[in-house]
């Protein structure tokens, strides 16, 4: 009887965490060491339609999805792929996997979550070093005196995010729809941005996408030969309404910049 490995993750979502979760699940299944069970959770408002039954790479995941998180026994291993505030140590050995952060500080609750796990994995040395060096003073609510230091006390390692070279590779084969869209671009030099445009006013959205548009327009305005900015972005819903909201944001930013602006 194989040991049970329960993976709690947004495995069905069209999100960065979803893609990483699917990579982890496929690797565990291919390893064939554990009885892999998968409990799918949401990731914000991102659609949960990333898995396709007719895709063999997805079917191995779909076949292991749980309808109920209750198992016949405590899992030997629990892998929780979310932000650390949500980490739950429900297994005999618990691994937290998080993308971490893009800055130099996190909430104290992140460290509390990491300390619940036996091992924490992050995708880059920057994230590892940042989380390893963050600490907070703990103040006693009753006496208002220092009661210690809150810091990460559990093993923290880097597990880099790989790439599927069956998809991401040089090729001379392009879909008709892609060719049709690219043919609409007149500029000879183009920048490509891929990422979410999340909530927040200009300069306050998490990925700073709005400021990217602003700086691009201000940098290349009034040039005789301008580059273009191609954006593969969305809010969270991947809908027509989402697209229109993105276009309105771009329009509002460009409206506040004088000059002959790039596309």
Language model: regions and residue ranges:
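N-terminal subdomain of nucleotide-sugar transferases
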Residues: 1-45, 51-54
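Nucleotide donor/acceptor-binding cores
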Residues: 2-3, 92, 189, 227
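Short beta-strand segments
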Residues: 6-9, 37-40, 79-82, 160, ...
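Extended catalytic core of nucleotide-activated donor transferases of GT-like folds
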Residues: 6-8, 45-131
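Short catalytic/ligand-binding loop motif for oxyanion handling, primarily in non-cytosolic enzymes
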Residues: 14-17, 36-37, 44-49, 86-89, ...
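Conserved catalytic-core segment of nucleotide-activated headgroup transferases in glycan assembly
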Residues: 20-22, 27, 165-263
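Short mixed-charge
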Residues: 62-71, 135-155, 243-263
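Donor nucleotide-sugar binding/catalytic pocket of nucleotide-sugar-dependent glycosyltransferases
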Residues: 119-177
């Amino acid at each position: 009887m194989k040991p049970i490995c329960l993976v709690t993750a947004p495995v069905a979502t069209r999100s960065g965490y979803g893609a990483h979760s699917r990579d982890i699940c496929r690797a565990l299944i291919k390893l064939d060491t554990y009885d892999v069970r998968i409990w799918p959770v949401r990731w914000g408002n991102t659609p949960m339609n990333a898995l396709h039954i007719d895709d063999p790479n997805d079917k191995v995941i779909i076949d292991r999805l749980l309808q109920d998180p209750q198992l016949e026994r405590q899992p030997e291993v629990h892998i929780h792929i979310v932000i650390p505030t949500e980490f739950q140590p429900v297994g005999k050995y618990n691994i937290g996997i998080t993308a971490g952060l893009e800055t130099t500080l996190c909430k104290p609750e992140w460290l509390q979550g990491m300390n619940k796990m036996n091992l924490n994995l992050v995708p880059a040395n920057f994230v590892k070093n940042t989380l390893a060096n963050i600490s907070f003073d703990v103040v006693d609510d009753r006496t208002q005196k220092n009661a210690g230091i809150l810091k990460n006390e559990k093993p923290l390692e880097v597990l880099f995010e790989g790439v599927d070279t069956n998809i991401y590779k040089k090729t001379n084969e392009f879909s008709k729809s892609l060719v049709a869209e690219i043919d609409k671009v007149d500029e000879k030099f183009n920048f490509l941005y891929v990422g979410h445009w999340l909530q927040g006013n200009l300069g306050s959205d998490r990925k700073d996408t709005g400021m990217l548009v602003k700086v691009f327009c201000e940098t290349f305005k009034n040039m005789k030969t301008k580059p273009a900015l191609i954006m593969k972005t969305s809010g969270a819903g991947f809908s027509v309404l989402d697209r229109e909201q993105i276009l309105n944001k771009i329009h509002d930013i460009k409206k506040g910049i004088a000059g002959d602006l790039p596309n």
